[in-house]
Amino acid sequence: MRINPTTSGSGVSTLEKKNLGNITQIIGPVLDIAFPPGKMPNIYNALVVKDRDTVGQQINVTCEVQQLLGNNRVRAVAMSATDGLTRGMEVIDTGAPLSVPVGGTTLGRIFNVLGEPVDNLGPVDTRTTSPIHRSAPAFIQLDTKLSIFETGIKVVDLLAPYRRGGKIGLFGGAGVGKTVLIMELINNIAKAHGGVSVFGGVGERTRGGNDLYMEMKESGVINEQNIAESKVALVYGQMNEPPGARMRVGLTALTMAEYFRDVNEQDVLLFIDNIFRFVQAGSEVSALLGRMPSAVGYQPTLSTEMGTLQERITSTKEGSITSIQAVYVPADDLTDPAPATTFAHLDATTVLSRGLAAKGIYPAVDPLDSTSTMLQPRIVGEEHYETAQRVKQTLQRYKELQDIIAILGLDELSEEDRLTVARARKIERFLSQPFFVAEVFTGSPGKYVGLAETIRGFQLILSGELDGLPEQAFYLVGNIDEATAKAMNLEMESNLKK
């Protein structure tokens, strides 16, 4: 972090104006720039092109140095469109990496990758800024406390609980509900959370970003009357941005979160949607820089880039960052290098299944694929652990029996297996839940279910006390009492029809 010196009108200090270069080549978002001998900028330095195009329109493009090519030339990646740039244009070396505003001034506002506000609410105080490139906290600074982060979502809290100050990944292919789940987590956690939240929209739809902003304003997380009272900062680098912006916008959001953790000593929530787009942008940039592609066409530096980002998302003795990251899974293949590299960094993984989404079970979380390092008896307690294991065993047995059921039918199963199947189907439906953010789609009000209620509900199903209830009574309800009430209503309706 640094307190900025007084800058001249152009926003670049007079001292820094001395180091000027010229564009020698433009290949899409990649620029080659020649500098005077002995005046070469460092890797990651920000370069600024300020000029006018052929029709007199003002150009202001910021780039980041990626390679030193020799012969006093550098190769840089642009953070915005390079339309209108021509060879020979003057380039200013700012002498420092990209820096973005941090602290209370960021709350309630929407920023782009450069830390410029894009919400038409006026300028932001830029006296306190922080460079987006910095090293991860030292090993001795890390905090290792273990505690559960309750989300109010049954399937998550029971089977793959989240760690406070941990890293959580939501894995899923296209259209299975990653963004809806992340919005629900923002709704359930960020609203009740005393600290601040930072949302990084990395290479996703602009519409999704707009929906989230409106939702935040309606719920009061962003306070329109007094913007300083807001609880969230939003950083967007959407699908239409050049790869340089999509590759760096995650670091911009993380830098803002780190300031709240390190300087304000707060507990921070960091939401990133979508971490795969960060990898995808890195792959595009890597190809443009002329690097040899690695497995499945990804960049050879995939592990390094992911590690550099993920190791900064951590909890220290000053404060914590709990991060929830959506991870797109290309072609539903979890062995693809992008999701596979992400897995290694996470404390909990919530895997979304297309099969469950096709059945209409939302959230479509796969109870057998989702994992958490927190699901241990010494952390969650014996009762929670035992219930979770029995639920998984029942669902696993049902999965094993599905082939037999498909060929021979339910009647060929033993009495015990028939009972297991009936309970597994109830469990599967009871793992669904109406979301607050999906009220407009489902027509049913959202439900927050506490952990104790969740455990009680599944224990009742496993014990056999509810074997007499129809399985549709367990679909899209909150706690178990709602399921029994729904069963009574279904019975009354069927009696009336008779």
From Swiss-Prot:
Q: What EC number is given for this enzyme?
A: 7.1.2.2
**Keyword Iron-sulfur recorded:** no
Q: Which reaction does it catalyse?
A: ATP + H2O + 4 H(+)(in) = ADP + phosphate + 5 H(+)(out)
Q: Where in the cell is it found?
A: Plastid, Chloroplast thylakoid membrane
Q: How does it sit in the membrane?
A: Peripheral membrane protein
Q: Which residues bind ATP?
A: G172, G173, A174, G175, V176, G177, K178, T179
Q: Where does the source fall among the domains of life?
A: Eukaryota
Family annotation (SUPFAM superfamilies): C-terminal domain of alpha and beta subunits of F1 ATP synthase, N-terminal domain of alpha and beta subunits of F1 ATP synthase, P-loop containing nucleoside triphosphate hydrolases
Any GO BP annotation: proton motive force-driven mitochondrial ATP synthesis
| Keyword Translocase on entry | yes
Q: Which GO CC terms are listed, alphabetically?
A: chloroplast thylakoid membrane; mitochondrion; proton-transporting ATP synthase complex
What are the protein's UniProt keywords?
A: ATP synthesis, ATP-binding, CF(1), Chloroplast, Hydrogen ion transport, Ion transport, Membrane, Nucleotide-binding, Plastid, Thylakoid, Translocase, Transport
Q: Which InterPro entries match?
A: AAA+_ATPase, ATP-synt_VA_C, ATP_synth_F1_bsu, ATPase_a/bsu_AS, ATPase_alpha/beta_chains, ATPase_F1/V1/A1_a/bsu_N, ATPase_F1/V1/A1_a/bsu_N_sf, ATPase_F1/V1/A1_a/bsu_nucl-bd
GO molecular function ontology, one term from the record = proton-transporting ATP synthase activity, rotational mechanism
Family, per the entry? Belongs to the ATPase alpha/beta chains family.
Protein's job: Produces ATP from ADP in the presence of a proton gradient across the membrane. The catalytic sites are hosted primarily by the beta subunits.
**UniProt cross-references to HAMAP family, sorted A to Z:** ATP_synth_beta_bact
The record's note on quaternary structure and interaction partners says: F-type ATPases have 2 components, CF(1) - the catalytic core - and CF(0) - the membrane proton channel. CF(1) has five subunits: alpha(3), beta(3), gamma(1), delta(1), epsilon(1). CF(0) has four main subunits: a(1), b(1), b'(1) and c(9-12).
Record protein name field: ATP synthase subunit beta, chloroplastic
Species this protein is from: Panax ginseng (Korean ginseng)
Upper taxonomic classification of the species? Eukaryota, Viridiplantae, Streptophyta, Embryophyta, Tracheophyta
